[in-house]
Amino acid sequence: MSFKSTASKHQAQTTVSKLFANILPNHTIGNDEDKQEKLSSTQLLSNQLKQSSVPLKKVKKKTNAKIKKINDSNTKFKKFVKYNIIKSREEHTVEEQKYLKKLVKRNASQIKNLSHIDNMQIEEELSDVRASLIDKIGKKENKRLRKRKLTSAKNSKFDDFDNKVKRGFISVPGLTPGLAPIDYNESDSE
């Protein structure tokens, strides 16, 4: 029998040898060396990919975990440096004040989440920090205690839009009384 390619010949031979192996008890399918010689290049490639795909996933997972850990440590270090730079200055810009307030809120929430601390030194340090914060907050001499109420950004956007409409900078689409449709009744729309 003639075959068009070695792959089809190999497939036919393996099918027949598997059939004989199921029927005849002493029949062997063939040597591994013969299989390697008779396999086409695509079959060899697919076999290699099947065998090496599982370890590649594990290796990729490990490398991604290492990269993530390095990135996390880099970001923590950058945040620490930024905090120390801001902390060393006497006067802070508005952005720096916002950043410091955000840090205070985050750290305060983390402290609140700790239910019980076993180490006595840490408890003493926390109580010292709390006391110093209360002292700093409590000393508001020569400062206003009340500030004027600020409108939220959402309300200010609406107010700005309404002011622009009133001044005529923005026109709102709609019907004017003279351009209403002829057969339009207000009672029909309700």
Swiss-Prot record:
GO terms for cellular component: nucleolus. InterPro entries: Rrt14. Keywords: Nucleus, Transcription, Transcription regulation. The keyword Transcription applies. Pfam families: RRT14. Its main location: nucleus. Belongs to the RRT14 family. This is Regulator of rDNA transcription 14. It comes from Scheffersomyces stipitis (strain ATCC 58785 / CBS 6054 / NBRC 10063 / NRRL Y-11545).
